UniProtKB/Swiss-Prot annotation:
The organism of origin for this protein: Alcanivorax borkumensis (strain ATCC 700651 / DSM 11573 / NCIMB 13689 / SK2)
UniProt GO BP: protein quality control for misfolded or incompletely synthesized proteins; rescue of stalled ribosome
Catalytic activity annotation: an N-acyl-L-alpha-aminoacyl-tRNA + H2O = an N-acyl-L-amino acid + a tRNA + H(+)
GO molecular function annotations of the record: peptidyl-tRNA hydrolase activity; tRNA binding
GO cellular component: cytoplasm
Record CDD domains: PTH
UniProt-recorded name of the protein: Peptidyl-tRNA hydrolase
InterPro entries registered for this protein in UniProt: Pept_tRNA_hydro, Pept_tRNA_hydro_CS, Pept_tRNA_hydro_sf
Lineage: Bacteria, Pseudomonadati, Pseudomonadota, Gammaproteobacteria, Oceanospirillales
């Protein structure tokens, strides 16, 4: 068994102009998980984000959506994790993933930032530790590097958004395994899913 997850972070950019863009897929996941748990995210300036808590098998699980821009996501994550003494190995970060198509999602532990500025800042703010869990939510690749920024900062087509939402629903369904520290079960179940 791996470490159980105690903090779940959804990456994105703040503001209405970004809320429906691909780069906010991590926020969509945390929003869906909060709805499933019947909790509401509220602003907490101390942690530079929107937060909520719920109980799972007697443990407190914390949700966080940073209200900083993507490249400052580590500021919020570190503030909350440090205050509640949550080790980096008990953090799950949900983020958009160019290297997976819409409709795919994958849990993993560790790894680099892959050019993702939110992950880069989280790694930096946690003493260069890469040992947190990730939920990679596929948004597809636009085909060339010069089109990546416009791609992640634009809205997906209705068909792609439906696929992303179905993958998020499946990830939410399998989050309980992550909360128990059963990474292998969570990975096997989610890796077998394709919307």
């Amino acid at each position: 068994m791996a470490d159980p997850v105690r903090l779940i972070v959804g990456l994105g950019n703040p503001g209405r102009e970004y809320e429906d863009t691909r780069h906010n897929a991590g926020v969509w996941y945390v929003d869906a998980l909060a709805r499933r748990q019947g909790v509401f995210l509220t602003e907490d300036k101390k942690y530079f984000g929107l937060t909520a808590t719920f109980s799972f098998e007697g443990e407190t699980i914390r949700l966080l959506v940073p209200t900083t821009f993507m490249n400052r996501s580590g500021q919020a994550t570190a503030a909350l994790a440090n205050f509640f003494k949550i080790p980096v190995t008990q953090i799950l970060v949900a983020h958009d993933e160019l290297d997976l198509p819409p409709g795919c999602a994958r849990f993993k532990q560790g790894g680099g930032h892959g050019g993702h500025n939110g992950l880069r800042d989280i790694i930096s703010r946690h003493g260069n530790s890469r040992d947190f869990y990730r939920l990679r939510l596929g948004i597809g690749h636009p085909g060339s590097a010069d089109r990546v920024t416009p791609h992640v900062l634009s809205k997906p087509s209705k068909a792609d958004r439906d696929l992303i939402d179905r993958a998020i629903d499946e990830a939410v369904h399998n989050t309980a395994d992550m909360l128990r520290g059963d990474l292998n079960s969570a990975m096997n179940r989610l890796n077998g899913f394709k919307a």
